[in-house]
Swiss-Prot record:
Gene from which this protein is expressed: murA2
Catalytic reactions of this protein: phosphoenolpyruvate + UDP-N-acetyl-alpha-D-glucosamine = UDP-N-acetyl-3-O-(1-carboxyvinyl)-alpha-D-glucosamine + phosphate
Keyword terms of this UniProt record: Cell cycle, Cell division, Cell shape, Cell wall biogenesis/degradation, Cytoplasm, Peptidoglycan synthesis, Transferase
Single GO term (MF): UDP-N-acetylglucosamine 1-carboxyvinyltransferase activity
Organism: Lactiplantibacillus plantarum (strain ATCC BAA-793 / NCIMB 8826 / WCFS1)
Biological role: Cell wall formation. Adds enolpyruvyl to UDP-N-acetylglucosamine.
Gene3D superfamilies found in the cross-reference section: Enolpyruvate transferase domain
Subcellular location(s) per record: Cytoplasm
Active site per UniProt: D116 (proton donor)
Name of the featured protein: UDP-N-acetylglucosamine 1-carboxyvinyltransferase 2
Keyword Cell division in annotation: yes
Length: 426
């Protein structure tokens, strides 16, 4: 494992460019195996999840190259094979291979995926969707075996009991080549779902309604890539750096941003008193001084993203009063709380609420990044704190943030990644 070493306590300034969306990328890469031609993606983030997904592709004889932010994937000689468990178990989004393999081969075997430990994220809605499409699903030990009869998959009406990004994407992947029309009701509306649908439609798929709560998929026999697909900017990375800029910035410009995707987040910053300058594809954050406390409640898109409730926490510590965070999506997403307390933060969990008090002075400490977004919160806090902060399990941060060390260096941060001898590899 790796650790992040931060010499904090100084103001940062400059500009940086937001990378492609992680949550799009981890769906688009499995989707590529549905194509009958090579496919190409641009603005691909340099994150560990991409590396692990490429390992999974290689195990199926799907070759890929990754140069200058461009990822080329050639699925024309794909072979069914057992997917590498070490790569599957390291990232949650590997479950998208269930839908993609089902769409390609009418069968799939996938080990239960890993990823962040932030409480239960069941796949029952995925299974419900596959069964509605005509698949037989068997769960055994830590694996899922999915198969169809000789008729293959067929269109169906599927009502999701809960709004689920993962289930919406997996059903799209399975249904895009199925016979007939599939309707997903109570579908997730995230921009990453629109991005996936755009990619598939440009290859000949017939998907309507992405971005609304009703998505209709008319199955097609084949998909052929015609052009490079540019991945949308990462709204979670954007929000993380907005929080950093408002916390410890002395004027920071974020480029390659879609402001419409950030409205629930930027509205909260404005409510705090941050003087954002929002342009067509960039956001400038001047130095922020007196900040008001706020109440944050996570919701499905277009509400406040659960992935941003931890990264905004270091900013809430600067507010003149107590802020409250309610995570309705993953109430157990509180790993950052105890770690921030080690740095002197006035923060606690109380009756499923996170109460964040004014903390004028954070002190560097040894802390642990239990998952991606708690790691981002600790990173911002470490940059704000006086002294040295060491974040163990920093691989979790590298999993989700594109070239994070390089970007922090461009802002003037004193930060580095080093081997962590005390934490063994998984």
């Amino acid at each position: 494992m790796k650790k992040m070493i931060i010499h904090g306590g100084k103001r940062l300034s400059g500009e940086l460019t937001i990378g492609g969306a992680k949550n799009s990328t981890v769906a688009l890469i499995p989707a590529a195996i549905l194509a009958d031609t090579p496919v190409q993606f641009d603005t691909v983030p340099h994150i560990l999840d991409v590396h692990n997904l490429r390992l999974i592709l290689e195990s199926m004889n799907v070759h890929s190259t990754f140069e200058n932010d461009v990822l080329t994937i050639d699925p024309t000689n794909i072979e069914e094979s057992e997917l590498p468990s070490h790569a599957i178990k390291s990232l949650r989004a590997s479950y998208y291979f269930m839908g993609a393999l089902l769409g390609r081969f009418n069968r799939a075997t996938v080990t239960f995926p890993g990823g962040d430990n932030i409480g239960p994220r069941p796949i029952d809605q995925h299974i419900k969707g596959f069964k509605a499409l005509g698949a037989n699903v068997v769960e055994e030990n830590d694996s899922v075996f999915i198969s169809t009869g000789t008729e293959g998959l067929h269109g169906a009406r599927i009502f999701l009991d809960v709004v689920s990004v993962g289930a919406t994407i997996n059903i799209i992947l399975a249904a895009v080549k199925a016979h007939g029309t599939t309707t997903i009701e109570n579908a997730a509306k995230e921009p990453e779902i629109i991005d996936l649908a755009t990619f598939l439609n440009n290859m000949g798929a017939k998907i309507r309604g992405a971005g609304t709560d009703v998505i209709r998929i008319e199955g097609v026999p084949a998909l052929h890539s015609r052009a490079t697909h540019t991945i949308i900017p990462d709204r979670i990375e954007t929000g993380t750096y907005l929080s950093l800029a408002a916390s410890i910035g002395d004027g920071i410009l974020l480029k390659n941003v879609i402001p419409e995707h950030m409205e629930s987040f930027t509205a909260k910053l404005v409510e705090m008193g941050v003087d954002l300058q929002i342009n067509e594809d960039s956001i400038y954050v001047p130095r922020s001084n007196d900040l008001d406390p706020i109440r944050v409640k996570t919701m499905t898109y277009p509400g406040f993203a659960t992935d941003l409730q931890q990264p905004i926490t270091p900013l809430l510590l600067r507010a003149n009063g107590s802020s409250v965070v309610i995570d309705t999506i993953y109430p157990q997403r509180t790993q950052h709380v105890e770690q921030l307390r080690k740095m002197g933060a006035d923060i606690r969990v109380q009756d499923n609420l996170i109460v964040v008090g004014h903390s004028s002075h954070l002190q560097g400490a040894h802390v642990e990044a239990g998952e991606i977004r708690s790691g981002a919160a600790l990173m911002i806090a470490g940059l704000a704190a006086s002294g040295v902060t060491e974040i163990s399990r920093a691989d979790n941060i590298l999993r989700g943030y594109d070239r994070v060390i390089d970007k922090l260096h461009t802002l003037g941060a004193d930060v580095e990644i080093a081997a962590d001898e005390e934490v063994p590899e998984n």
